[in-house]
Every structure is written in C-alpha cells, then in structure tokens.
Amino acid sequence: MSKKISGGSVVEMQGDEMTRIIWELIKEKLIFPYVELDLHSYDLGIENRDATNDQVTKDAAEAIKKYNVGVKCATITPDEKRVEEFKLKQMWKSPNGTIRNILGGTVFREAIICKNIPRLVSGWVKPIIIGRHAYGDQYRATDFVVPGPGKVEITYTPSDGTQKVTYLVHNFEEGGGVAMGMYNQDKSIEDFAHSSFQMALSKGWPLYLSTKNTILKKYDGRFKDIFQEIYDKQYKSQFEARKIWYEHRLIDDMVAQAMKSEGGFIWACKNYDGDVQSDSVAQGYGSLGMMTSVLVCPDGKTVEAEAAHGTVTRHYRMYQKGQETSTNPIASIFAWTRGLAHRAKLDNNKELAFFANALEEVSVETIEAGFMTKDLAACIKGLPNVQRSDYLNTFEFMDKLGENLKIKLAQAKL
C-alpha cells in the first residue's frame, strides 16, 4: 500500500488479561500499518476502572455516543476473588452492562463460520444472529414465596389519580406456592424493534421475532403489535426493496425452524429467550472463540463491537509464567472489523469498507488453509488427538494473519 487509509473517529476500549495482549497485537500488526485513525482510547483494564471509580467506563460510553463507533476488548467483571486479587475498592459492575445502560440498544451475537471447523448443527452454513432484548421481564421481576392460603392480586394505580385497577392472579386455597410480577416498557420494546430492523437492513437478511403470544395474549401480544406497527410504518418498503421480510413466530415453532434452517437470518428474542437461545446457538456453531457481539443502538448510527468471550484467564496465567499459549484472536479481530465497517458505512468510505472486509476474509481463509490456534485444532481432531504441529501459538498465528493480510492488500493494489 502506498498510503494509509483514512479511517475517521473510533472509540477504542482496552481490556484485561490475555485479550488485552491480543488487542495490542491486533492494532500493531493488522490495523495501524494500514489505517490512520482518529483514535479515542479508554483503558477499561480492571486496575484503571478501580483507580477512576469506574468513571472511565462512563466516559467511554459517552465518547461512543459522540463518535458513533466503539470497539471493545474483553474485560474482567469482578467477583469476590477478583476483588481480593486486585485489592479493589468495591465489586465494580460489568463494563458491558454500564455501557449498554448508557447507550441503550440491543446486543446481537453472530458466529464466524469456517468450512473446516465442524458444527454441532451441521446444516447451519450461514450465521444465525440472535438479538436479545436485554431489559425487563424475569430479570427485573418481583417474585416471592406465598406462605399459605390467600389471594395474590396485582394493582395498577394511575399517576393521574383516576380509578385503580386490580387483577386477581391466583386464589391459593390449599397451601402456598410462588408468585411473580414482571413488566416491560413500550419505549424499551420500540428501541428493541428499531435496533432489530436496522440490523436486518444492514445484513440484508430476514428478521423473525419470537414470542408466546398465544398464552401471554396481552404481554407478548404487546411485543408483537409494537414490532408490526413500526415495521408497517417505517421499514416495510425498505425491506421489500432489499427482498427481505419480517415475520412474527411462536417461540416453539421458531426453535424448530432454526434447527432445520441453513441460517442466514436475524432472530429477535425476548430477554429470557435470548439468554437461553444465544448460548444454544453459540454452541451449535462450535466455538465461543468464533462469536462476535455487536451492540446496535435504536438510532441505527451508533454501534459498539466486541468479542463474545471473556479475558482467557487460564492462558494469561500461562503467559505470565513464560509458557507458550495458543489463544484465538478471531472474535477480537472481528470486533475491530465490525467497528471499522460501520465507520465506513457512516462516512461512505469505500477504502475502509474494503479493508474491513479483506481482514475478515483473511482471518477465515487462513484458518481454512489449515493455520489455526489450538482450540480450533481441537474442534477438528478432538483435544486428545491434537499434536503441536496441528496449531500455531498466539504470536505465530498473529504473524501469519499479518503476512496474509499484506499479500491480499498488495494483490488488491489498495
């Protein structure tokens, strides 16, 4: 390449442990040699979050709001052991949760598929992107044990002082049981719908919303009605122009359809369904090391991309002792490519779009040519059968990717 590609503004968030080391290698070997970025860096490593009382996480989220593109390295969410290990002031919340609460939006998870990595569901030849509505329902419910006979009722008290409305949930006549009250808000469901429609348009894939509205006629019916209304008013013509579609499906029918399908669609799930199905689908594709996670905000302009896995602590402990590691960087690389691709789309930057796509192609082609990390070799051969000659270590694999990217870009005369 004769000159670097002008990449525009990107918010970059550094992370923890082995993924932090990989993150620096990605920048050094795959991004910075080719792209000139107006980079806004925030250190979300656990020590710096503690030193700033987690203000750095909030600052990073505000920066993403301002510049519309964020790329994030995996971070530690501390438990008691981590509080002790790092002598933290307190058990800081998940940075992902903090960022999501500030930005809003929906998290979409997508598998990165290589032909030579076996899938548990062999028919899935294209990704299934799961969008989880990460608000309300069971996760913000009030539940309790009913100690004995009696009535459980739910009451709505209007703010304007008009008549209260009370609903009988159940009349416990023979002993106690359990009860729960849960909720969601129209605004949150609307945001979820917009993010889902935006994602479908950006991928050019159909969108399905799954609920159980035959049983929860009012509750799940509200999700169905809001999605349909927004689709008809704002997205239907765009979908038809792209020859894609939106459909509501019952959750049980949708699960069966997904198993039989070849993939290649967006699946919008309510909170609990998304929690369960995203892990189920991830496992079906074979490896969490090959799973991207993108937060899409309802404005369709603001996106934050990251790997769907953790900080790979076990490998970091080996690295600290000077032992060889073979850590898969692919999901972290795709956090960068998805962020850069979105920047390219916002700025109509064709060179940057080509670069992001080329780096994704190189990542997949390198693995399909037989150069991979140990976790992927284990997917193919089974861990007990893996020899050292079957895989590259962390640094060898990054070098191989760098070498192949250089060749691809030279061939493209970019």
Curated annotation (Swiss-Prot):
NADP(+) binds at residues 75-77, 82, 260, 310-315, 328. Substrate binds at residues 77, 94-100, 109, 132, 212. Keywords: Acetylation, Cytoplasm, Glyoxylate bypass, Magnesium, Manganese, Metal-binding, NADP, Oxidoreductase, Phosphoprotein, Tricarboxylic acid cycle. One of its GO terms (biological process) is response to oxidative stress. The gene is IDH1. The modification N6-acetyllysine is found at residues 81, 224, 233, 243, 321. The record marks 139, 212 as: Critical for catalysis. It is found in: Cytoplasm, Cytosol. This is Isocitrate dehydrogenase [NADP] cytoplasmic.
